[in-house]
């Protein structure tokens, strides 16, 4: 049986933006992935004290954003899970759902890579997947040796990218909408229309 190489891109996607799509495309092409699965979070444990948009809206925006790319798909497994969202649990679920020989490539930013040794079941995460870490503009390159000291085995699991450097964030999109500014250059057109039609991120 031939192994399937599957990229995993998780996030609140509140909203999904062009930077997410650029990252997914870049990693797919560079590593020769067969597909990329987008996984909107339920209630992330690290954002337990923050209000995020309803899961249905975030899921719908992801579906709209990737509708023209057959090698992208979305799964709602974290949204359906009750309680806090943990990456290790999601990776274990994927191992049971996806074909047996599937290789998982988990995408994250350099900032999240720095925090990874403190994540829930971090050692299990690096056992279940390859890590693919990409920068944002202005971020300092992580000290991989130091991270490996904190989480032995991380370096062996890691693919450290120097690009794409993405300078877009969901918080920037939300802020611009709240201030009545356009976001068509930051999100796909269908997502911009959805935000407007559903009055997301507007001042209450």
From Swiss-Prot:
Q: Which cysteine pairs are covalently linked by disulfides here? A: none
Q: Which GO terms describe its biological process?
A: NAD biosynthetic process
Q: Which GO terms describe its molecular function?
A: ATP binding; nicotinate-nucleotide adenylyltransferase activity
Keyword annotations from UniProtKB, A to Z:
ATP-binding, NAD, Nucleotide-binding, Nucleotidyltransferase, Pyridine nucleotide biosynthesis, Transferase
Family matches, as InterPro entries: Cyt_trans-like, NadD/NMNAT, Rossmann-like_a/b/a_fold
- Keyword Nucleotide-binding listed? The answer is yes
Pathway info = Cofactor biosynthesis; NAD(+) biosynthesis; deamido-NAD(+) from nicotinate D-ribonucleotide: step 1/1
What EC number(s) are associated with this protein in UniProt?
2.7.7.18
What this protein catalyses is: nicotinate beta-D-ribonucleotide + ATP + H(+) = deamido-NAD(+) + diphosphate
| Stated family | Belongs to the NadD family.
Function description: Catalyzes the reversible adenylation of nicotinate mononucleotide (NaMN) to nicotinic acid adenine dinucleotide (NaAD).
PANTHER family reported in the protein's UniProt record: NICOTINATE-NUCLEOTIDE ADENYLYLTRANSFERASE-RELATED (PTHR39321), PHOSPHOPANTETHEINE ADENYLYLTRANSFERASE (PTHR39321:SF3)
What protein does this entry describe?
Probable nicotinate-nucleotide adenylyltransferase
């Amino acid at each position: 049986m031939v192994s399937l190489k599957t990229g995993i891109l998780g996030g609140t996607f509140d909203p999904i933006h062009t930077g997410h799509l650029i990252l997914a495309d870049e990693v797919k092409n560079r590593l020769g992935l067969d597909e990329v699965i987008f996984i909107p979070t339920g209630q992330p444990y690290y954002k337990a004290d923050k209000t995020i948009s309803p899961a249905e809206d975030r899921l719908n925006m992801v579906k709209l954003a990737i509708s023209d790319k057959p090698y992208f798909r979305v799964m709602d497994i974290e949204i359906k899970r009750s309680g806090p969202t943990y990456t290790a649990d999601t990776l274990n679920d994927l191992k049971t759902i996806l074909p047996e020989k599937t290789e998982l490539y988990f995408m994250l930013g350099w900032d999240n890579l720095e925090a990874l040794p403190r994540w829930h079941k971090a050692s299990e995460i690096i056992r279940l997947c390859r890590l693919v870490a990409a920068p944002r503009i202005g971020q300092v390159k992580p000290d991989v040796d130091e991270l490996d000291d904190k989480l032995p085995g991380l370096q062996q699991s890691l693919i450290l990218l120097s690009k794409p450097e993405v300078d877009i964030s969901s918080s920037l999109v939300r802020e611009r909408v709240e201030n009545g500014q356009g976001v068509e250059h930051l999100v796909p057109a269908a997502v911009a229309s959805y935000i407007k039609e559903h009055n997301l991120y507007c001042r209450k």
